[in-house]
Amino acid sequence: MSQSETFEKVKKIVIEQLSVENPDTVTPEASFANDLQADSLDTVELVMALEEEFDIEIPDEAAEKITTVQEAVDYINNQVAASA
């Protein structure tokens, strides 16, 4: 899966999970907490949705380090590549 395909899937999930009104605000640099107003519960639900969509496990330690959309994309691509 390409970087852009992963980004589009992550973006779709972020928009759904965080009820983002303006999809243009979901950029690679967007911070879940600061730019997209996600609280800790939102973040947990987002991680669960990403795990389900991409069929991966994201340990709590890793999830805590994923603070932007791009970090999520990079983590997912690394996990998918490692399991291929």
UniProtKB/Swiss-Prot annotation:
Q: Ranges for the Carrier domain?
A: 4-80
Q: In which pathway does it act?
A: Lipid metabolism; fatty acid biosynthesis
How this protein is processed and modified after translation, per its record? 4'-phosphopantetheine is transferred from CoA to a specific serine of apo-ACP by AcpS. This modification is essential for activity because fatty acids are bound in thioester linkage to the sulfhydryl of the prosthetic group.
Say if the entry is tagged with keyword Cytoplasm. Answer: yes
Keywords recorded for this protein, A-Z? Cytoplasm, Fatty acid biosynthesis, Fatty acid metabolism, Lipid biosynthesis, Lipid metabolism, Phosphopantetheine, Phosphoprotein
What Gene3D superfamilies does the entry give? ACP-like
- Modification O-(pantetheine 4'-phosphoryl)serine, positions: S40
Question: Can the keyword Cytoplasm be found in this entry's annotation?
Answer: yes
Q: Which superkingdom is the protein from?
A: Bacteria
List the Pfam families hit by this protein, alphabetically.
PP-binding
Compartments reported by the entry: Cytoplasm
Q: Which GO terms describe its molecular function?
A: acyl binding; acyl carrier activity
Alphabetically, which GO biological process terms does the record hold? lipid A biosynthetic process
Please tell me one Gene Ontology term that the record gives under cellular component: cytosol
Q: Which sequence ranges are marked TM in the entry?
A: none
Role according to the record: Carrier of the growing fatty acid chain in fatty acid biosynthesis.
Q: Which PANTHER family match?
A: ACYL CARRIER PROTEIN, CARRIER DOMAIN-CONTAINING PROTEIN
Q: Which family does it belong to?
A: Belongs to the acyl carrier protein (ACP) family.
What NCBIfam families does this protein map onto? acyl_carrier, PRK00982.1-2, PRK00982.1-3, PRK00982.1-4, PRK00982.1-5
Q: What is this protein called?
A: Acyl carrier protein
